[in-house]
Design a protein with these regions (language model features):
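Alpha-helical scaffold segments in soluble metabolic enzymes
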Residues: 15, 160, 207, 299-306
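A structured beta-alpha segment of the ubiquitous adenosine-cofactor-binding alpha/beta core
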Residues: 18, 112, 124, 171-236
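Active-site-adjacent "lid/gating" segments in soluble enzymes
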Residues: 63, 75, 135-142, 211, ...
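Alpha-helix N-cap/helix-initiation motif
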Residues: 128-129, 197, 288-292
Length: 345
């Protein structure tokens, strides 16, 4: 409606929107699962209740002063690691306990002998759209076997986003198999369809879990648990399993049920406020979906670190990644600059 009938849409929505404050609209969106988020300024980001509830915001010292500083955008087995402005190379070692590394070195050597560093690794990908599926694809490009799990009646909706065009003409073929975006995000994967409301499907999924190294998902918090596939259930059949959950705002906190697309996540995190001109309203990043691939790269980093530790120790891990926190992570220079100067970047 906003694209085809923008004036009519504004006429319907604007009067209602102006009757509410920004905080009221955010509360209504969270209560009713609406895809809406406030556009936070940089000076508001560090005071966001969701970030403090999850322990994202810590402190660092510089030039004799203390500044609020965000940690990494994920918790590993319910542990948060804080990052330092000058830290390099050792960040994840503070979150993942050290090990002897002997088995790790042996397994890595064996994998390299197969040609790719992650050969022999199996990943179950319950993700949809972009952020989680792209983690699986990058792991597949490094040699992992990735199995995409979909619901037969409700497949990944990216399957229906556009058609292949060749020489100016739409290429004919099955609707679900002809999306260039789907193949870009999911190339190289095996696939299986499971109706997880059926007990036999859950049984089959658990059989795959028992033979896998990593499970990835980006559903709303609680979705996997309601299907009988929460981390505690999965760990019972595979103690070495790593699970990566990538919801919009993390698995807990006052905004945990945030429903979002990439632009609304960018607004929630304050990134949209950086796009514009001085003394004018923020333009925002419009429809540029930075939130998805940015979360994918953070998820990949966390998953590789946890998998490395699992190979060395035999202990799995649960990774609770927040996609909006991943956006805050790339804004650290602006957050520090705003505190030092007292001005909005």
């Amino acid at each position: 409606m906003g694209t085809r009938y923008p004036e009519e849409g504004d006429a319907l929505l604007a009067p209602w929107l102006t009757r509410h404050t920004r905080d009221e609209l955010e509360a209504l969106a969270l209560e009713h699962n609406l895809i809406l988020s406030p556009l936070r300024r940089i000076d508001e980001v560090l005071a966001t209740p969701q970030f403090h509830h999850r322990g994202l915001i810590g402190n660092t010292s510089m030039d004799g002063r203390s500044y609020a500083w965000p940690g990494l955008p994920f918790r590993v087995s319910d542990r948060r690691v804080q990052s330092e402005p000058n830290l390099s190379g050792t960040l994840l070692s503070r979150c993942l306990p050290a090990s002897s590394g002997a088995e790790h070195a042996h397994r890595i050597a064996a994998s390299k002998a197969d040609g790719l560093p992650l050969a022999g690794l199996r990943v179950l990908d319950f993700g949809w759209v972009w952020s989680a599926p792209w983690v699986g694809t990058m792991l597949g490009e490094m040699g992992a076997q990735v199995i995409k799990v979909e619901h037969g009646a409700r497949p990944d909706n990216v399957r229906l986003s556009g058609r292949i065009i060749r020489d100016g003409r739409v290429v004919e073929g099955p609707n679900r198999e002809m999306s260039p975006m789907f193949h870009q995000i999911n190339h190289g994967k095996l696939g299986i369809t499971l109706n997880l409301k059926h007990p036999r499907a859950v049984e089959l999924a658990m059989g795959l879990v028992a033979q896998s190294d990593l499970v990835i998902e980006n559903m709303s918090p609680g979705s996997m648990e309601r299907s009988g596939l929460g981390f505690e259930s999965l760990r019972a059949v595979n103690a070495r399993l790593v699970m990566l959950s990538m919801s919009a705002a993390g698995q807990f906190g006052p905004a945990a049920n945030l429903r979002a697309y990439a632009p609304t996540m960018s607004a929630f995190a304050g990134l949209e406020s950086l796009v514009g001109y001085s003394n004018e309203p923020a333009i925002g990043a419009l429809n540029f979906a930075l939130g998805d691939p940015n979360a994918s790269l953070h998820g990949l980093l966390a998953a590789l670190a946890a998998l490395s530790r699992a190979r060395a120790t035999g202990e799995g891990a649960y990774i609770d990644l927040s996609q909006v926190e991943s956006l805050v992570s790339v804004m650290r220079p602006h957050l520090l600059s705003a505190q030092r100067s007292g001005r909005q970047p």
